[in-house]
Swiss-Prot record:
Disulfide bonds: none annotated. SUPFAM superfamilies: Undecaprenyl diphosphate synthase. Homodimer. This is Tritrans,polycis-undecaprenyl-diphosphate synthase (geranylgeranyl-diphosphate specific). CDD domains: Cis_IPPS. InterPro entries: UPP_synth-like (IPR001441), UPP_synth-like_CS (IPR018520), UPP_synth-like_sf (IPR036424). Its cofactor is Mg(2+). The gene is uppS. It catalyses: geranylgeranyl diphosphate + 7 isopentenyl diphosphate = tri-trans,hepta-cis-undecaprenyl diphosphate + 7 diphosphate. Keywords: Magnesium, Metal-binding, Transferase.
Amino acid sequence: MGILGKIKNKLKSIGKRVIIDFYRFLDNSGVLKIYEKILEEAIDKDNLPKHVAIIMDGNRRAAEIYGKDRYYGHYLGAEKVREVLRWARDLGINVVTLYAFSTENFRRPKEEVDKLMELFEKKFYEIADDEEIHRYEVRVRAIGRINLLPKNVQKAIKYAEERTKNYNKFFVNIAIAYGGQQEIIDAVKKIAEKVKRGEIEPEDIDKELIDKHLYTANLPFPNPDLIIRTSGEERISNFLIWQSSYSELYFCDIYWPLFRRVDFLRAVRDYQRRQRRFGK
């Protein structure tokens, strides 16, 4: 990178920090609390999305703003999860799916991936033993190619799933080692095996049959009504591509660790302002 490129990036970083400082000023002044209240009162509790999926993007860029390493950004992002789940639950949303780690993310530097795996292991154990999780009867599940994860992470996931398997008040799905295209490929392979064994005929294959063979098959409301992506990127990045055919998409400029309740409420309000046609 040339000197002009470095200067440009530095100015961009400074600009983001100014915005963050401004957000903090608003928080401290109480203006955002007033706006939050206005948004909350504007939301129709009878027209909430049943399932909200979130692409939690921007951890590394948030770390750059603070002059920290990437792990710091991932740590902040993991801490943000608890807050967002509380916002969703308190609002009356039933299901939240979080895109935590894609199959493509394995291509990142080994040191970063290793630290992420340590963080995932720690957080799954924390979730499983969290008093709030049990008080509100939250069911926790991981979806993806779990077999690709280190054994210690698989063990932590199993522990969290076992500890919460009998709950049905609120559902949290963690998409980890997940890829939407791979999910469809895996579903097709399972169906092909059943055709080969004579259990089903090719003519039996339809949308409902494919639904039953996806990672999300046993989830309540498997198709998200609303998908939120943070960081300003406007794409779904191989996330729930089968299930999101009629999802409403909401893109938010703020990085995931800096995501605020007011941003969440704005996404829900925006969802309620749209007319869902489902292809009609």
